[in-house]
């Protein structure tokens, strides 16, 4: 067990294998598997939830753990964060954001409410689609912030792109402010997603 848990790759593969075994067991208890729209909808919802947890988890890690504690780290130790931990976290952060939005759009399409949600149900007046639509737009805005504001500014702030010290400091502040904007939007976004799935 120690060998399995000492390797992240082995741990993730074992988790995936366990999930597949559970999936097969539960579906066989339900008279087998039909690879139909319901199956694909379930699969994309599962993917959507997993990558959304990673995305928002990293967003909250940056805002609740890393940013508030950077001032407490001695200057000689800061390169460990800026050169190693932050770039790795930002890789998963930005790709989780992209896959969350993409899987959410596919899920909405498979369930037949993509257009209704994207137009906030104007014209049809379906409250569930209005709620999920608000959540989708908030998620799209947040993902846009990740890819087109936070990431470019973080590259300058972390020294991944050469720039002068003044631009580096300005970029760090801009990245932080947009990260905080995403934190501000995260609870309303999650609220509308949960409302759409559970109140209607």
Task: Identify the role of each PLM range.
Residues 1-200:
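Polytopic transmembrane helical bundles with strong interfacial aromatic enrichment
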């Amino acid at each position: 067990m120690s060998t399995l848990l000492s390797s992240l790759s082995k741990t993730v593969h074992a988790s995936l294998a366990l999930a597949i075994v559970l999936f097969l067991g539960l579906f066989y208890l339900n008279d087998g598997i039909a690879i139909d729209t319901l199956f694909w909808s379930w699969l994309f919802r599962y993917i959507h939830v997993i990558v959304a947890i990673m995305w928002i988890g990293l967003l909250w890690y940056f805002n609740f753990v890393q940013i508030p504690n950077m001032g407490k780290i001695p200057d000689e130790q800061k390169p460990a964060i800026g050169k190693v931990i932050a770039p790795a976290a930002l890789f998963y952060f930005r790709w989780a954001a992209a896959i969350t939005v993409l899987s959410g759009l596919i899920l909405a399409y498979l369930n037949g409410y993509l257009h209704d949600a994207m137009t906030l149900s104007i014209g049809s007046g379906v409250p569930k689609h209005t709620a999920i639509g608000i959540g989708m737009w908030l998620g799209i805005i947040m993902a846009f912030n990740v890819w087109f504001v936070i990431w470019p500014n973080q590259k300058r702030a972390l020294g991944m792109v050469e720039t002068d010290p003044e631009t580096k400091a300005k970029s760090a502040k801009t990245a932080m402010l947009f990260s905080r904007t995403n934190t501000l939007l995260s609870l309303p976004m999650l609220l509308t997603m949960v409302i759409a799935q559970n109140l209607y």
